[in-house]
């Protein structure tokens, strides 16, 4: 979960001395499938990018077109407000999902119409320079597609967030496939990885469209973390699981068989996720330890302060990626939070990892899919805590110099401004 904190500048560089552009921009960040200001990775990225823009004299408004909360586990209670200098509003009139199927459809319709009216009102008031749309790229959806058409009629440039592998359209006639493309009607793309930036460039060429592309990696507020000092006596590994990524946990459990042979007291803490994996892959040498082995501790979802504390106290932080397009496209935000905790990160050589991290220097990096090699990287950490601490500290330096959110405020503002001026 994210929480609202006092905005921080980069701990090493700051932003107070930077010149502020004169023209005030107005940006709407439109989200559909997650809440604000509290939530998970997407919420945190919206919060940090919005904060970076607010520090650059951009008036940012977040419109949530759908409810985000389930009854009994409500994190976002306010329908409108201000968080970190970012205005937000739930256009459905509530944050909580109704129990009734009919009322859910009514709330969804109200949120959609409310979004259209809010955008029209902002446009009429000359307070809508650009819309930054977060609609998800893994499947085609009629709602976002129609929304882009609507914004085109208002002559408002649309930026789309691209942080996952896009869907592949069926083998339909070219004219239909072009109209259903993720980029149809879009002016700009913010891509979280170079793989996605290259995909967007290729898709724009296929469509014959002029689409501006900004490769903006994961962002983190390094001031949120409180790194601990020195090596840790307790051997504790932490894996922050994401929904839909059971294979990663199964891979880790396979690797832990080898780790436990050398370090039988080592514990694995798993946060978040969907559920325990149904099985450990076939190359495991023992039964699935997930539900029964006391060394595997599943804590579920925890509040953000507790999560960051777990990161800071861990012997190592785990995040394996796989040799497939899904992993090559994504760049998990938790990597930035791991690095900011100044604890050693154990990952695999896929996608953006090779761009930003060096094995044995700023992280421990194994080849993808090799559970035994991944286990040996974990063992390296546990065998030499002092060296692992040095690697963790070097990783923090990477987070500060490369991923701190305020580093990207000027670049993102310039991107928004250029698209806005192109429509004037």
Placement of each model-derived feature along the sequence:
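A short, active-site helix/loop in glycosyltransferases that binds the activated sugar's phosphate group
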Residues: 168, 182-211, 222, 279-283
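Short hydrophobic beta-strand element within catalytic cores of glycosyltransferases
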Residues: 319, 337-347, 364
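Nucleotide-activated donor-binding/catalytic signature segment of Leloir-type glycosyltransferases, i.e.
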Residues: 272, 280-309
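A short, well-ordered alpha-helix in the C-terminal region of glycosyltransferases
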Residues: 380, 387-402
